[in-house]
């Protein structure tokens, strides 16, 4: 089955989503800390039993099983994506290495011929010899760099220790606040088709009278054991793209709905990620844009 992933995004206006925005700002630093910690735990021990890690996160940070699961799955997805990117990068480097090696195989014999001719002190041959010698020297340097890079990439894949940073050192040195906002800028809620509204912790309900999606978000951390409405944050939004398709998924429950709240330049956005079967692609393009 060929599955296509779609992502649609809308802005969360504070006037309609104050509870959600306030909760995001309240917990984002703690959430991001857990996220980074989980990344390094899984990176250093990829064979770790995930159910034990999930339980540990619940107990240590007062988060639900679903929130812990969302963090773990997101981290696993990032690591898998990085691994595939590294494999692609290796193929690209190997292609370049092969091209340089073939060129060197052709040029080195020519260099030896020119070296013999240059001994006769022919100025033209001497210039050609020096130019080709310089060219080959630079090509050998490039070849060595490619070999070292390929070895480094293979080592990263074998050890699971990828070179990744959460934010840049340059931004950290220039502006600490901007660095933190860039690094700690999103919360993910991974869904499942089997759950209510295809997501247990973040749910949408479409209200046709106002043409809006009502948001119900389950809160964690110090709110984990709260009862009733104190456990939730509410808001509303509308998606300009794929709105009809999203409403259909909420009815049919034929795709998990994963949500991502992102803070970007002091504005808040909601992304919804869902899947459709490729056999319905033509129908989707026609009916939903």
Segments from the language model and where they lie:
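Nucleic-acid substrate recognition interfaces
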Residues: 1-289
């Amino acid at each position: 089955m060929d599955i296509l992933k779609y992502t649609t995004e809308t802005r969360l206006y504070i006037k309609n989503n104050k509870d959600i925005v306030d909760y995001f700002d309240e917990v984002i630093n703690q959430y991001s800390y857990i996220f980074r910690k989980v990344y390094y735990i899984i990176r250093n021990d990829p064979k770790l039993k995930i159910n034990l890690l999930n339980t540990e996160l619940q107990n240590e940070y007062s988060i639900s099983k679903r929130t812990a699961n969302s963090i773990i799955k997101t981290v696993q997805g990032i690591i898998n994506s990085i691994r595939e990117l590294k494999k692609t990068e290796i193929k690209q480097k190997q292609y370049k290495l092969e091209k340089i090696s073939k060129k060197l195989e052709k040029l080195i014999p020519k260099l030896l011929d020119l070296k013999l001719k240059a001994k006769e002190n022919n100025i033209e041959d001497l210039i050609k010899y020096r130019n080709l010698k310089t060219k080959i020297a630079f090509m050998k340097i490039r070849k060595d760099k490619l070999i070292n890079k390929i070895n480094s990439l293979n080592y990263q894949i074998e050890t699971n220790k990828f070179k990744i940073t959460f934010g840049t050192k340059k931004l950290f040195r220039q502006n600490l606040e901007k660095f933190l906002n860039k690094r700690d800028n999103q919360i993910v809620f991974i869904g499942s088709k089997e759950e209510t509204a295809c997501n247990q912790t973040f749910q949408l309900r479409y209200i046709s009278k106002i043409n809006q999606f009502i948001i119900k978000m389950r809160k964690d951390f110090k709110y984990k054991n709260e009862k009733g409405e104190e456990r939730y944050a509410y808001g509303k939004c509308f998606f300009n793209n794929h709105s009809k398709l999203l409403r259909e998924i909420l009815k049919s429950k034929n795709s998990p709905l994963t949500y991502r709240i992102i803070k970007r330049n002091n504005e808040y956005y909601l992304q919804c990620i869902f899947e459709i079967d490729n056999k319905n692609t033509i129908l989707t393009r026609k009916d939903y844009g």
